[in-house]
Amino acid sequence: MREESWEDHDTIQLTAQRKYLAEVQALETLLTRELSVFLTEPGSKKTNIINRITGKTYALPSTELLRLYEHLEQCRKQGALMYFLERQGTYSGLMLDYDLKLNTNAAPPLEPPALSRLCHRIFVHIKNSSVLPEGSHKIHFFFTLKPEVVQGKYGFHVLIPGLKLAASTKKSIIGSLQHDATVQKILHEQGVANPESCLDPHSASVPSLLYGSSKLNHKPYQLKTGFELVFDSSDPDYIPIHQIKNIESYNLVSELSLTNEQGSLVRPVYCAADIAAEKEEEIPTEDHSLSILMLHDPEARYLHKILNLLPPEYYVEYPLWSNVVFALANTSANYRPLAEWFSQKCPEKWNTGGKEKLEQLWNDASRHTEKKITKRSIMYWAHKHAPQQYKEIVEQGYFSILAEYVYSYNGMLEHYMIAKVIYAMMGNKFVVDVDSNGKYVWFEFVLPGQPMNQGEIWKWRKEVNPDELHIYISENFSRVMDRITEHIKYHLSQPHETNILNYYKKLLKAFERSKSKIFNDSFKKGVIRQAEFLFRQRSFIQTLDTNPHLLGVGNGVLSIETIPAKLINHFHEHPIHQYTHICYVPFNPENPWTKLLLNALQDIIPELDARLWIMFYLSTAIFRGLKEALMLLWLGGGCNGKTFLMRLVAMVLGDHYASKLNISLLTSYRETAEKPNSAFMRLKGRGYGYFEETNKSEVLNTSRLKEMVNPGDVTARELNQKQESFQMTATMVAASNYNFIIDTTDHGTWRRLRHYRSKVKFCHNPDPNNSYEKKEDPRFIHEYIMDPNCQNAFFSILVYFWEKLQKEYNGQIKKVFCPTIESETEAYRKSQDTLHRFITERIVESPSAETVYNLSEVVTAYAEWYNANINVKRHIALELSQELENSVLEKYLQWSPNKTRILKGCRILHKFETLQPGESYIGVSTAGTLLNTPICEPKNKWWEWSPNPSAPPEKEASAPTP
């Protein structure tokens, strides 16, 4: 049978003894029903008794103290565990605490002759440090010893309960004893390695354990012997001493109490202090918050053990220490004592402002929830540094929790009890939250070695039913229950009294019935239902995938928050659920698949500036935060590669991050507020959306267009779902064989659009004299786009361009110089927006112009130009005025003194009139034909070039074919 640790023994035994020891039951009744009227506030000066089990403190009068001592003595004789302390008052007995380091692992003999010599030396210092009263007095010395040597350490207490001394006198006695050569010699003879420093200087005032009680996780000290010393002031040189006989016949809890004044053997002897009582310092009340926490919170005991596995750098180095503090604070506000204990493992830092730093960190953790490190990280660190010890502690922790239930409820286990242990076992791996439909939903953190779909590793996987927990209950949990069986049988094999053996027999019989339930399906379902409440982490679903810089990938989580991007392929606490199946590998232009794709991009988009701009734009699809308000309209007659490229982006990002959108979303009228729009909901949380293959002359709904492009919140709902609000985060591309019709003059809409027209066509038999005809390769559509190697390579290209955009353009697409797309966008706008065409052809910026035009004059000029060049129609002046105010002329319009709009700093040209010196057209110049724009490549590899208006690229050789 594997023995439980003493810590586990304490908690289990405390539970068991309440069942079979009538003395313990009587003690609890006394405390809860009769002595509760004497309860005090923690830290009260009136406190004289402290119950470490409950943390309660009492101010008991002498009569009630005697009753308590009687109950404690009966419990002690039955071997019950107790944790009671007495607070030393202004005048109380003397306790000397010796903490010994031994030369061997054998306990020192400490036989009566040596202890008698110690009594004499101690009394000499008592005489020298206090004023003993006149007359003859009996002074009793008791020696209690630590039950065993632990790693070369041992200890004993000297109790002189009848001699009532002031705290200052006790300190004086202890101070002089520390330098007593005779005492040091006696201890040295006993095999003590540290006789000069083994006496604890703080024993003069700290609360003292009542006899039979112990610190949590320690065995109580045992009485070795006692001596009676007789002192007569009339003959101070004659001090007889003899060993006390029949010492066990007395109530030892009462007799060894430092504050009791009504003992049968020990009578009080009051000594005058050498320092006035009014100058006495306060007697402290020891802080037992950590002990109480660990006694009542199994998880705290468990964490205490786990923290002990962390190497020194975790409490010495500030970054690691602060992470531990944050993890404890984020796990539970009650774990502050654990944080203090862990911080004190480095005394140098704790004593130089450590407490203040801890206070600040603890408060920061409650305010800054973005640093969501929890106990899961502590578990990971401990397992990393001490895997074998970690495994043993974890297994022991499960055993302790289950054992408490078994002993508390006489072996009968119900659903919640099993669920509680399962939570301790799997609480770091599973989380439950309630979804928008009010249903409990399970999530499992997927680790290597589990059955999984590609991409689920190191992420939170949604489970319809936690099948692993069902299996775990029957297979793994049964092993923990077997340990309980061993534990009970071990006690049955011990020489206990009949009533205790009968208790264990009944316990084993009931427990064996409970064990069989874990193989029952309906019972396990009940356990899972109860586990839902324990595993519940409120708002967990809302926190999933909220960091736009984190992308779930096939081999972990990719962080693009820093440059270069960082692959997280180990334990982490980022709440990531979504993912793409693509594995991230760093960009390598020498990779054959990367070369293939770089060449393909060069063929699809022949203009270098346009190719770079489009790749920068598409790279923003891996970021799911707010972006620049842009949409790319891509025109092409077919067989030009645009569909391949758009689909490849979508396939690489996967359905969680990308979506193909129905073109009706852009062309149809907006639905009414109460109606669902599943197509629009496809954009929620997506980083990329694309439209393709429209009919001829599709008219875009400009209000929907602006809503989709503008950054900010939108609302929509799925069928049979509630209305939701979400942010538009998608990088959007709309491709068509025909130009879209955009019937608006609103500059706010047009400035969000970019237009590119494909020039290249992939043919079966390309014309060798036409540089825009390329040899088609069906493998791109039918094979490469589905090949994981191709997809991985393209994803690395997207990440490369994202990093390049951040480094060189501060992440802003509008800073990327691209004359091709600018001129094509301008030409496209002119073909759609006649008002803009008029402005860019007939109105020029003229800083020296003295003419100021009323807005009505501009309206008239436009109407005349329209009727002469477009079509004769009736124009509504008010509508035209509003359109001009929202056009590219907006920045040139001013308010006149009479509150009318005027055009200033510009000149309206007459037909065939040319520019004057210093004048320039408004808008982008489109001089020259777009088809004749030279294809100009840089000497270096094209993907390395950074568009710069002041440095045109030089001719470059294309990337080599793999």
UniProtKB/Swiss-Prot annotation:
Enzyme class per UniProt: hydrolase
Annotated positions binding ATP: G636, G637, G638, C639, N640, G641, K642, T643
Hydrolase in keyword set: yes
BP terms from Gene Ontology: DNA replication
Domain SF3 helicase as annotated: residue spans: 607-775
SUPFAM superfamilies recorded: P-loop containing nucleoside triphosphate hydrolases
Induction record: Expressed in the late phase of the viral replicative cycle.
Presence of keyword Hydrolase: yes
UniProt name for this protein: Putative primase C962R
EC number(s) per entry: 3.6.4.-
Record-linked PROSITE patterns: SF3_HELICASE_1
